[in-house]
Regions:
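N-terminal carbohydrate-binding accessory modules
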Residues: 209-210, 279-320
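Surface beta-strand/loop "capping" patches
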Residues: 200-230, 306-309
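Beta-strand-rich binding/interaction modules
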Residues: 129, 219-253, 260
Length: 320
């Protein structure tokens, strides 16, 4: 773009253009179809879980008091501002957006806990179970979980999520989302915008795992983090040739420590051209999760001409 065209592209002194909504086939979701039916957290999968995506009730309020009336239905996990949600309304900084739905708990198993998982809620979320505050989270981009166990009752349980999003009017909001979109700034999005699900776990469960491939030593390190103090629980780690459940087992390690290194021997390296992934199962007591990893290493080095390059698996790798 030359200087004249650059000046013409400026918004200064221009009248506001006519606004219209962009829509695609992806914004159309049949009412009977469950959005995103797959397990939402591919690197830490549990077998028994319940998808809570779908139609929730919602209400906009000007106060923090939980409303008795509902404004309608919203399709989770689509933000209220987008067409797919069925709402098409902006959440303003001084408003609150409430989500409501019920879950059925026929029986509360002994020695189990029920975790409610959120992929992301923008921006400040507070969760209530049967009218009692169960937890919350500040930040619109990270996942979080809430333990519902203490607030449950047998039968029907009501969940309520209160959301506030101050967007670009507060120090917490940075980026291109704006209440006055134009140019490179786009309409702010708010509320639940990633999948919601629940899963039963034992009293002591895997809260987080970290898998680190060690390319040079043909091994992989696995760290586990439990939800509470570790009392010497045995952890079992199994690495398979692929993510298929019946794939050949390469190595198994049992330990009471929270970190273990497993030797793979000859391995298939990961690259964009050959994206081979190994499957891994991690067990800690009664809890079990499935995950995966690729054997690769990144770095910066000099090529044969002495030019600094990005290296993948010990070789210069071009990317643009």
């Amino acid at each position: 773009m030359d200087f004249k065209n650059a000046v013409k592209a400026l918004q200064i002194g221009k009248k506001e253009g006519k606004k219209f909504r962009l829509s695609t086939e992806f914004g159309k979701n049949p009412e009977e179809e469950l959005p995103f039916p797959e397990y939402p957290r591919p690197q830490m999968r549990r077998e028994n879980w319940t998808n809570l995506n779908g139609w929730w009730e919602y209400a906009f309020t000007e106060t923090q008091k939980m409303p008795k009336q509902r404004d309608g239905k919203i399709l989770v996990p689509f933000s209220p501002e987008c067409d797919a949600s069925g709402v098409k309304r902006q959440l303003l900084p001084k408003e609150y957006l409430w989500y409501f739905r019920t879950i059925q708990v026929p029986k509360i198993p002994a020695g189990k806990r029920l975790l409610l998982q959120f992929g992301a809620v923008d921006q400040d979320a507070v969760l209530y179970c049967n009218g009692k505050r169960a937890g919350g989270h500040l930040g619109g981009y990270l996942s979080f979980s809430v333990d519902l166990t203490l607030y449950l009752k047998t039968g029907e349980n009501e969940l309520a999520v209160k959301v506030r999003d101050e967007t670009d009017t507060d120090w917490k909001g940075r980026g291109k989302q704006s209440l006055t979109p134009g140019g490179m700034f786009y309409t702010a999005q708010s509320g639940i915008w990633q999948s919601v699900w629940m899963e039963w776990v034992p009293e002591t469960y895997l809260e987080r795992i970290v898998i680190t491939p060690e390319y040079d030593t043909a091994s992989v390190k696995v760290r586990v983090f439990l939800n509470g103090p570790d009392t010497g629980l045995t952890k079992k780690i199994t690495v398979r040739e692929s993510e298929a459940p019946d794939a050949k087992v390469i190595c198994i390690r049992e330990t009471r420590e929270n970190e273990a290194e497993l030797i793979l021997g000859n391995f298939a390296g990961w690259s964009p051209e050959h994206p081979h992934l190994y499957g891994v199962s991690i067990e800690a007591g009664e809890d079990r999760v499935e995950s995966y990893f690729g054997m690769r290493k990144f770095g910066i080095g000099k090529d044969e001409k002495g030019i600094t390059r990005l290296f993948l698996n010990g070789k210069p790798y071009f990317q643009n």
